[in-house]
Amino acid sequence: MVTMKDLLECGVHFGHQTRRWNPKMKKFIFGVRKNIYIIDLQKTLRYFRYTYNVVRDRAAEGQTMIFVGTKKQASETIKKAAISCGMPYVNHRWLGGMLTNFGTIKKSIRKLEIIKKMREEGQLDLLTKKEALMLTRKEEKLELYLGGIKEMNKLPDMMFVLDAVKEKIAIQEARRLGITVVAPLDTNCDPDVVDLPIPGNDDAIRSIHLFCNEMAAAMNEGKAALADETGVEVEPISAEEKEELIAEAVAEGEEFNFAEEGENA
């Protein structure tokens, strides 16, 4: 579990400049140094350990957590942390309705599944060059935005968010659905929108690594305590689904309006 030394070495105590802050974070601020807010690491350590234990215990009950972080310095770390504990993730762009309109999102995930299956079976080689090209482009875009949640068969129980300000839409959707929000809180964040806050820097690379890796470790520790595992039934792909998808990809051409479809459905 995280130590005070870890927090100091990763620069978790460095907040934003004093002109960029949320007054609600005052209780987590230790002081100011060269116009930079310094976060109280005693409180960070206490909140960090409490949150770790809660996440671990919920994972031991079979609960799941989606990892969300789309800013450049967090994207790859979010992906690696989520994969290391077998959890879903979004690390490029949060599409409106990803949770609140999950039914539509699942239809798009189904399309990705069909294209991949066709590729594995060599069926793309039997199509015209145009059809194969359009399906390949569609697959790439679906994979970019939905690759991290393609095995998410139900809504998650928890959401770990890296940068609560940037990912406010994801947090709003989670709160609307009663999904527990876990997030580090920098000095510009609103603690009222997070269920399990951990005051700390959410911009520095080493700090980001620490938060992500600890949450993944908590999930893995909890999952290890599970006695039983359940299998997932694979839905067969029909010929009609394949034909419809080929026609759809060709009709779309280079345009991919799945985001609007998810938001407006």
UniProtKB/Swiss-Prot annotation:
HAMAP family: Ribosomal_uS2_B. GO terms for cellular component: cytosolic small ribosomal subunit. Belongs to the universal ribosomal protein uS2 family. InterPro entries: Ribosomal_uS2, Ribosomal_uS2_bac/mit/plastid, Ribosomal_uS2_CS, Ribosomal_uS2_flav_dom_sf. It comes from Aliarcobacter butzleri (strain RM4018). It holds the Pfam family Ribosomal_S2. GO terms for molecular function: structural constituent of ribosome. PANTHER family: 30S RIBOSOMAL PROTEIN S2 PROKARYOTIC AND ORGANELLAR, SMALL RIBOSOMAL SUBUNIT PROTEIN US2M. The keyword Ribosomal protein applies. This is Small ribosomal subunit protein uS2. Keywords: Ribonucleoprotein, Ribosomal protein. GO terms for biological process: translation. NCBIfam families: rpsB_bact. It comes from the Bacteria.
